[in-house]
Amino acid sequence: MKYDISRGTLAIVPNSEENSLVYEDDSRYIVNETPFKIMEDSCKYFGSTYNGRKDSAKSILGAEYKVPIIVEENNNIIVFPTTSPSSADCVWISLGIRK
């Protein structure tokens, strides 16, 4: 299953070496891609690159590590890594999470 991050995405969690669990408002999916691959593909889907979005966030925020990534600005799709994005344990949390 291919997955692109959307407004309904809450979290992307590593499930195994090559799989992810994606949590949405009312659903949970197993995706046959790593969380980082989902991030890269989603940034491309919305017309940019992961590295371009990361570099912009670093420049604007003056931060170096674990910067939030604006996946799609018109719908405020913003995700935060819980650890280094290159780590196999990195979980991506959406700014859109609500109680």
Language-model features: locations:
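Eukaryotic intrinsically disordered, low-complexity regulatory linkers and tails enriched in Ser/Thr/Pro
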Residues: M1-I93, I97-K99
